[in-house]
Each structure stands twice: as C-alpha cells, then as structure tokens.
Amino acid sequence: MSYLLAIGIAALIVALIIAIVVWTIVYIEYKKLVRQRKINKLYKRIRERAEDSGNESEGDAEELAALGEMGPFIPGDINNL
C-alpha cells in the first residue's frame, strides 16, 4: 500500500512540475505576442503619419486651387465680394 502511495505522490509531483513548465512556456509566448502587437501598432502609426505628412501638401494644393477659382485677388478693390 505504501508503495502505491509513494508512486501516486511522485506522479503528482511530476505532473505539477510539467504543469509549471508548460504554463511558463505559455506565459513567455504570450509576452512575445503582446510585444509584437505593440511593435506592429507603433509601425502602423508611424506609417500612417508618414502617409499623412506626404498628403498634406496635396491637400494644401487642392485648397489653393479652390481659392484660385474665386477669381483674382485685387487688394485695392474693396467691392470684390
């Protein structure tokens, strides 16, 4: 009987050690995944900012073109409204 009890306790200890190792590996992989998500988010943000900064000049050009369609600006002519 004590022989079976010793085997049972040893099996529980081995199972506990295996569970600790498995959950440690899962935790390490989870931290890697979270870190990669943060990197991807920063990369996406930087890429969007780069696209935005390139498009600002195009937006300004469109605004200037829209203002240019109003007619010529004559500083001395007050009734140009």
From Swiss-Prot:
Query: Per the record's keyword annotation, is Phosphoprotein included, yes or no?
Result: yes
Segments on the Extracellular side according to the record's topology features: 1-7
Query: Any ranges marked Cytoplasmic in the topology annotation, and which?
Result: 29-81
> Annotated Gene Ontology MF terms?
CD4 receptor binding; monoatomic cation channel activity
Keyword annotations: AIDS, Apoptosis, Host membrane, Host-virus interaction, Inhibition of host innate immune response by virus, Inhibition of host tetherin by virus, Ion channel, Ion transport, Membrane, Phosphoprotein, Transmembrane, Transmembrane helix, Transport, Viral immunoevasion
Domain of life from the UniProt record: Viruses
* Regulation acting on activity, per entry: Ion channel activity is inhibited by hexamethylene amiloride in vitro.
How does the UniProt record describe the way this protein sits in the membrane?
Single-pass type I membrane protein
- Can you tell me where the transmembrane regions are? 8-28
- Its primary localisation, in coarse terms, equals host cell
* SUPFAM superfamilies assigned to the protein according to its UniProt record, in alphabetical order: HIV-1 VPU cytoplasmic domain (SSF57647)
Assembly: Homopentamer. Interacts with host CD4 and BRTC; these interactions induce proteasomal degradation of CD4. Interacts with host BST2; this interaction leads to the degradation of host BST2. Interacts with host FBXW11. Interacts with host AP1M1; this interaction plays a role in the mistrafficking and subsequent degradation of host BST2. Interacts with host RANBP2; this interaction allows Vpu to down-regulate host BLM sumoylation.
Free-text comment about domains: The N-terminus and transmembrane domains are required for self-oligomerization and proper virion budding, whereas the cytoplasmic domain is required for CD4 degradation. The cytoplasmic domain is composed of 2 amphipathic alpha helix that form a U-shape. The N-terminal and transmembrane domains are required for proper virion budding, whereas the cytoplasmic domain is required for CD4 degradation. The cytoplasmic domain is composed of 2 amphipathic alpha helix.
The entry's other comment says:
HIV-1 lineages are divided in three main groups, M (for Major), O (for Outlier), and N (for New, or Non-M, Non-O). The vast majority of strains found worldwide belong to the group M. Group O seems to be endemic to and largely confined to Cameroon and neighboring countries in West Central Africa, where these viruses represent a small minority of HIV-1 strains. The group N is represented by a limited number of isolates from Cameroonian persons. The group M is further subdivided in 9 clades or subtypes (A to D, F to H, J and K).
HAMAP family in the record: HIV_VPU
Know the name of this protein? Protein Vpu
Q: Gene encoding it?
A: vpu
